[in-house]
UniProtKB/Swiss-Prot annotation:
<dbReference type="GO" id="GO:0000324">
    <property type="term" value="C:fungal-type vacuole"/>
</dbReference>
<dbReference type="GO" id="GO:0051286">
    <property type="term" value="C:cell tip"/>
</dbReference>
<dbReference type="GO" id="GO:0045332">
    <property type="term" value="P:phospholipid translocation"/>
</dbReference>
<keyword id="KW-0472">Membrane</keyword>
<keyword id="KW-0812">Transmembrane</keyword>
<dbReference type="Pfam" id="PF04479">
    <property type="entry name" value="RTA1"/>
</dbReference>
<dbReference type="GO" id="GO:0005794">
    <property type="term" value="C:Golgi apparatus"/>
</dbReference>
<dbReference type="GO" id="GO:0005737">
    <property type="term" value="C:cytoplasm"/>
</dbReference>
<dbReference type="InterPro" id="IPR007568">
    <property type="entry name" value="RTA1"/>
</dbReference>
<dbReference type="GO" id="GO:0005886">
    <property type="term" value="C:plasma membrane"/>
</dbReference>
<dbReference type="GO" id="GO:0140326">
    <property type="term" value="F:ATPase-coupled intramembrane lipid transporter activity"/>
</dbReference>
<dbReference type="GO" id="GO:0016887">
    <property type="term" value="F:ATP hydrolysis activity"/>
</dbReference>
<feature type="transmembrane region" description="Helical">
    <location>
        <begin position="40"/>
        <end position="60"/>
    </location>
</feature>
<dbReference type="GO" id="GO:0032153">
    <property type="term" value="C:cell division site"/>
</dbReference>
<feature type="transmembrane region" description="Helical">
    <location>
        <begin position="156"/>
        <end position="176"/>
    </location>
</feature>
<feature type="transmembrane region" description="Helical">
    <location>
        <begin position="14"/>
        <end position="34"/>
    </location>
</feature>
<keyword id="KW-1133">Transmembrane helix</keyword>
Amino acid sequence: MYYDNAFGYIPAHWVTILAVILFSIAFILHVACLAFTRKWLVIVPIIGTIGELAGWACRLDASYNPDDYNAFLGQIIALIIAPVFYSAQAYVLFHHIVLLYGPRFSVLSPKLYGGIFITFDIIALILQAAGGGVAGGADSGSQLQTQGSQIMLGGICFQLFTIVVFSILFSIFFIALYTHHPIRPSTGRREPDVPYTRVRTMSCNCLALATFAMVVRSVYRVIELAQGWEGAVITHEVWFDIFDFIPMIFTSALLIPSLYPALERSKLPFTEKHVSSMEYAPSEYGPSEYGPSINDITNMSAVIYPDSFLAPKDPKKSFSSEEL
């Protein structure tokens, strides 16, 4: 049923309450993860979840006060900005996955994923925030509102383009990895050969699902804004709940187990600098096409971290794949 307010409907109480509860739980889990891991990258999805929580709090207020224009404006800005932090987290996590499994399977250098895609995310964020502010502060049906909507649409289209390109590169990497067909030629330097485990596979699958959810949400937002403020999509709450709320709560939850490769990589006895600049001696079993053996990594640890627990006291002892 159409309602003559900024939304075009009255937000459902139960949906907004459910969203606030679920994003509150997600926020608590992300904060707990930060306290447990003490890794700065966990802060990024926390900011995104705070944004989602703020946006749905505004929608909850609007469910009781449907004519409150400030609530409408607040939810527009918050729910447009928040997903940018989720996508930024995905780019950073993929950077760590590439370093963990081998840059030779990636189209781009690992450091470029964060640099290029986060820069694009910032551009999309600025466009969407600026457009949302202009459109939200303008009179309904005015030319200024139309201009603001067009700016927002440009920002969300750019964000969709960015995440689709990222998804393609993401897919290419894992296809090359699982088929053992390196994309980039070997430079002669050795890279870590990390075996697959159920936990590693689950973590990568969670990141893939989170990325897909963000693509779905972006496609919906493009269609919504392309139709305008009085279009059939934006004035029907059910589409917003299905294609924005559900993808974003799943994304927030899925980014938690997706942290595993980044946390695991920090335990390996070498850093990105060592991977990119050091030559490693082959193991007693000879060189491997896909990277060093466990003995190679053990030998590296003794050189790089001679005083750490990673360097075995017995030179004949090597690490098992589970210890890595």
